[in-house]
Amino acid sequence: MKLQHIKKQLLTVALTTVAMGAMAQSLNSAYYTEDYKFRHDLNPAYGNDQNYISIPALGNVSVNTHGNFGYQDVVMNNPMYGVENGAKKMTTFMNPYISTSDALDGFSTGNNRITGDVNIALLSAGFKGFGGYNTIEVNAKTSFGIALPYELFEFAKNTGNNSYDIGDIRAHAMSYGELALGHSRQINKKLRLGAKLKFLFGIARADVEMNDVKADLTANDKWLISAKAKANMSMKGFCYKQETKEYNDPSKGEYEYVNDVDVDGAGLSGFGMAIDLGGEYKINDSWTVNASVLDLGFMHWSNNMQAANRQDTFVFDGFTDMDVKQGNGNEVFDDKADKYGDQLADFANLTDEGDQGSRTNRHRCHHQRGCKLQASMLQENDLRLPELYTHQGCLLMDRRQTECQLGSSEMA
């Protein structure tokens, strides 16, 4: 087991994750854009002055990602650039010339998360009626997320003779269809409320977990790495494909491991429901506050195809006191290598454990809060004709990413 190989795999996961965030477009900038017809997706209390209908699959396509770490936390300026011949301008946080405090400063001491959503509006329409504004939507959606503990990055940066309790590593992805019915109305001059009922039709959900990951490197003569790996897949007609191999030790017989997947047919595998709730309150002519809770609900899946590793520990105690051939009373090098190979086969490979039955997942929920400030100023120009300038600023907080966005626009 080569630690450098492990570190490269961890870096690949981190770079792939943050790259998804770098390519994303955020819809939050449209939160206070009055002419944006799909603001009700951010807060169901919002309506429109006009009726509308979108072009199927082209009316609204959105990609959103949220996270508490980014590309700049993984890839950094190389302190040896221009100092050492051949040094590249950029390097990773694992570079030995970058201090541990600087390398790990951008990562949360809890879980480091990136989540994302892709939404394609197959049909969307809005119209006035029933005392308010109504929306009907048919959407194709995909969501994904990954959670990496701080200790994982600490292990990658400071691999040495220490004990590391890394914790749980989790990733998931889900694809589903959505039928959403929304209604909003003005309660009084100051308050507007809205709600949206969503029917969810599950296509597929995948969850990959490595639980209780630990690395004990304190002993000079033995390294121990442990983790319980598990993959769960809910999808109609899905199954794991396995291959049979023989252990290096003939006395252990054969083992099976997952090397491919197969989908026989297609269709819906899950059903769920969710609601959006939102409100907007006008304090006075200058201040307006609003809040929304989105995707509060669940998804129930009819199957759960599971695969897991057979052995949750890998022990490496070196190649000391080895003989090349039998006869000197010591363990033979080839036999020791075969033992490690068999141990790794059980630790690193997944085995099909069949359908575990139905399961229910909580739908990922988030909420947003915002406020809008509008101020007017009377100004005279050279012709002494009055001009009214309106400055509007907004502050939006999205609880999925714990960051504030400040935007403003000027209209003459």
Indicate residue ranges for each PLM-predicted region:
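Conserved short hydrophobic patches within well-ordered secondary structure
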Residues: K2, I120, P386-E387
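Bacterial N-terminal signal peptides that target proteins for export
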Residues: K2-L11
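N-terminal, post-signal peptide beta-strand-biased segments of exported outer-membrane/organellar beta-barrel
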Residues: I6, A22-T142
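N-terminal cofactor/phosphate-binding cores enriched in small/glycine residues
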Residues: L15
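Short, solvent-exposed beta-strand-terminating loops
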Residues: L58-K89, V138-L152, R205-K214, F298-R310, ...
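Hydrophobic alpha-helical hairpins/lids featuring a short glycine-rich hinge
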Residues: V118-I146, H172-K198
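Outer-membrane beta-barrel porins/channels
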Residues: F153-A412
